[in-house]
Amino acid sequence: EILIGLVGSEMCIRDRFKDNTGGKNADYIPYLANIDKNLFGISICLLDGRTITLGDSSYCFGIESVSKVHTAILALRQYGAEKVLKMIGADATGLPFNSIMAILLENDHPSTPLVNAGAITACSMVQPLGKSDKKWEAIVSNITDLCGSAPQLIDELYKSETATNFNNRSIAWLLKNYNRIYDDPDMSLDLYTRQCSLGITAEQLSIAAATIANDGVNPVTKKLIFDASLSPKITSLVATVGFYERTGDWLYTSGIPAKTGVGGGVMGIMPGHFGISAFAPPLDSSGNSVKAQLAIKYIMNKLGLSIFGSTRFTITG
């Protein structure tokens, strides 16, 4: 039996890593380059709805690629697992998250909704087709359901992203060339850019992760958000490519499927136990938060947990 109070020790976790100077803010998006590099927050949401929050867990940061998990869930809710597999796919590319080469090498499908090409395709699939405002409402409503509270669009980040997303424009139209996008490419790209520009907190992301870990039931609102049969599909997508080309190393050392974003957030799913999120802007060379990785790995190792193991424990306190 491991007491949750041990996991929640700020001295033991946050203070252990807060002075780490590794990594640097994403500098190709001006808004992200200017975020305070010393921000650092951690949140754990248990399946009974209790949350443990440390440091800057209520700071609103850009969700960026962590939003791909949420839109993948929306696609699964609207189309079902079989159609999503056929229309997008579930394979890791082994290449960077924004790779155009991955599309050229496997032009029969975008590979997975958790890389840029697949995420833009997922946005194109959002119903109702052809109606940008309604599609956006569906995207925001889905994220609100998962997090238990609404995200807020960061206008400055959206403008910054829109002004610099040349690579994603190429991806959208290349998908169109291969008939792997299902609505207007420019509309789909704008929806994707907007969803990446949503402001979110570590606490909100931990609740979303706990909803996945809890078979689709939000542990805070107690509402059923999606069918329990989808939870293993979502977790498998995250386990396969959540850290892009570094996913294998991450799973090997942490034992928890997690999705990362260049805004500095990491969201981890421990099925049947909890959701966890950590946030710190400085990134490693693969675009993953240095301190968030350290904190989550530390917690998982302290608990002796792995999604691939048979360890059982009880959370008390």
What are these regions (language model features)?
Residues 214-317:
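Structured C-terminal helix/loop/strand segments within mature extracytoplasmic catalytic/sensor domains
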Residues 32-35, 111-112, 163, 255-259, ...:
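Short Gly/Pro-enriched turn/cap motifs at secondary-structure boundaries
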Residues 1-8:
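Single conserved hydrophobic/aromatic residue that forms the stacking wall/gate
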Residues 162-165, 173-233, 284-289:
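Penicillin-binding protein/beta-lactamase superfamily catalytic region
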Residues 58-60:
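A short acidic/small-residue loop/turn micro-motif
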Residues 18-54, 267-268:
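A short, well-structured edge-of-sheet supersecondary motif
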Residues 48-49, 62-85, 208, 276:
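Active-site SXXK
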